[in-house]
């Protein structure tokens, strides 16, 4: 499996056993100025959701793209 690890659509081959791509977003102290923090990566299972954190998981190559800004 390959998953996006950066915002420039650069994908990375996931380690063996990690077949899930994820996009994790959350707010920190600068959320109102900079927007949500974002983490892209691979996992063996979809990470557990914690309060204030959004996680989207998918299982096809490079399916975890993240688009900044609002659609026009």
UniProtKB/Swiss-Prot annotation:
Q: Which residues carry this modification: Arginine amide?
A: 72
Q: How would you describe the post-translational modification of this protein?
A: Amidation does not significantly affect toxin selectivity, since the activity profile and binding data are reminiscent of classical long-chain 3-finger toxins with a free carboxyl termini.
User: Where does this chain mainly localize?
Assistant: secreted
> What CDD domains does the database record attribute to this sequence?
TFP_snake_toxin
Cysteine-cysteine disulfides: 3-21, 14-42, 27-31, 46-57, 58-63
GO CC annotation? extracellular region
Q: Which GO terms describe its molecular function?
A: acetylcholine receptor inhibitor activity; ion channel regulator activity; toxin activity
User: Could you say which tissues express the protein in this record?
Assistant: Expressed by the venom gland.
**What keywords were assigned to this record?**
Acetylcholine receptor inhibiting toxin, Amidation, Disulfide bond, Ion channel impairing toxin, Neurotoxin, Postsynaptic neurotoxin, Secreted, Toxin
- Database matches in Gene3D superfamilies: CD59
* Compartments where located: Secreted
> Is Disulfide bond found in the keyword set?
yes
| Family of this protein | Belongs to the three-finger toxin family. Long-chain subfamily. Type II alpha-neurotoxin sub-subfamily.
Q: What does this protein do?
A: Binds with high affinity to muscular (IC(50)=114 nM) and neuronal (alpha-7/CHRNA7) (IC(50)=58 nM) nicotinic acetylcholine receptor (nAChR) and inhibits acetylcholine from binding to the receptor, thereby impairing neuromuscular and neuronal transmission. Competitive radioligand binding assays also demonstrate that this toxin competes with epibatidine binding to the Lymnaea stagnalis acetylcholine-binding protein (Ls-AChBP) (IC(50)=4.9 nM).
The further comment given in this record reads: Negative results: does not affect alpha-3/beta-2 (CHRNA3/CHRNB2) and alpha-3/beta-4 (CHRNA3/CHRNB4) nAChRs at 1 uM concentrations.
User: Could you describe the subunit structure of this protein?
Assistant: Monomer (predominant).
> What name appears for this protein in its UniProt entry?
Alpha-elapitoxin-Dpp2d
Q: Which organism is it from?
A: Dendroaspis polylepis polylepis (Black mamba)
């Amino acid at each position: 499996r390959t998953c996006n690890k950066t915002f420039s659509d650069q994908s990375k081959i996931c380690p063996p056993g990690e077949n899930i791509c994820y996009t994790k977003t959350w707010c920190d102290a600068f959320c109102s100025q900079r927007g949500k923090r974002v983490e892209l990566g691979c996992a063996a299972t979809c990470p557990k959701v914690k309060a204030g954190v959004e996680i989207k998981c998918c299982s096809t190559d490079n399916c975890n793209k993240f688009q900044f800004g609002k659609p026009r």
